[in-house]
Amino acid sequence: MKKFTSKYFHELLVFTKQPTAEMTETYEHKTDIVLAKDGTESRTALRSKPRATYAFKFSEDSNEAQGLYNVFHDKLRDKYAVPVWTQSLKLKENTPEYSTELIFEGKDALYVDWALIDLDVMIYGMAILYESEDNFEVVEVGFRPEWDDLNEYTVVALDIGTKTKKSWPSGTVVMPLRPCYISDKVMQSRRGLTNAYTLTFQVLNNAVLDEDTPETVEDIDVYLTQYLSSENAVRAIDFDSEIDSFDPLLGRFYKRTTWLNNRVGSSMRVVTTNLKEYYDARKRFQRHRGKFRPFWYPSFEDNLKIIEVNNDKIEAIDDGMSDKYKYLYVMRVSTGEPSSFAIISVVRKPDGTMTITLDRTVDIDVNDIQYVSYITYCRMDTDNLSLSWVGNGVSVSNWRIVELAPSTKKLLT
């Protein structure tokens, strides 16, 4: 670890001990809630951006233990500069034909791999060129990344006062640096010659991510990524004491003392497999968690068995669920492109089938239908959310959604 004097954040201790360790990235929002007698609710965001923390676990041998003890004991409340390797990119030369050349010293702009353009480097922030724990360089950033149409690379323009001081090979890791402080305590566990450390950094200037507007229905977001039980997804089983009852058809019910009606809820488990998915998950969570922005979520476990499509009518096997989901209908075709429809009426027949009349013609061949499911009106049921970085591009996050006033609020008129 080395000291670095920043023109924006003054003296910082660059914490480079953990670039391959597990990390849990937590975002904490704060909202004010007003509950009505019927259980409906209104939430107001009290923070414009979430408070972020990074919790690390890493090991060092006994030769490093004494030095680390002195650092943590002496600098417990001092400021650190912590690399965020969950947003790391590769350094490249500014022309493809010279992509294996060195990035020479004195550069005031760096080119990074264009395939992951979401480098979360802040204006008037810091970045680190990292090769090893003892071989790195900190630079201050004057501008956000910009797209270079000529060379198809993302250009990170560095502040004029912090040109590179040495040459770096193409492929060097580039990571954002966040000014942080140790928010609680440092735990040191000794086992033989190995010392395990656990500590949490709180970020002083967390970035507000640019929100991507997803698919919408009636100006309300739709989550079309499947996280519930299926051959491609896993339902989390870490349910807590708030469970009130269980229905195999409807899933879990949640009930709290402030609610006069039950809410249908589902626990989610989101697994990302690369940095791009991880970054997209962070943006999606930020959009819907802190502001408790409602969204539509397809009930993937209720896959309707379609018999025939005729203009604005669908013949399907009666599943007994259509009375519950009166509002919207989602259709997913083999191309992966979803179409959404409002349910006008449902007619059940003695032969065990039903006719669903929709708000417009279904211009899709019945053989081209991949998936049909209802849409429920939901929100995330938490102020906080953690993404646990396991390594090698893999992260895991568990969270829960609940329906908003199910079967009591008419959403379409």
Give the label of every model feature segment.
Residues 1-413:
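Extracellular/virion structural assembly segments
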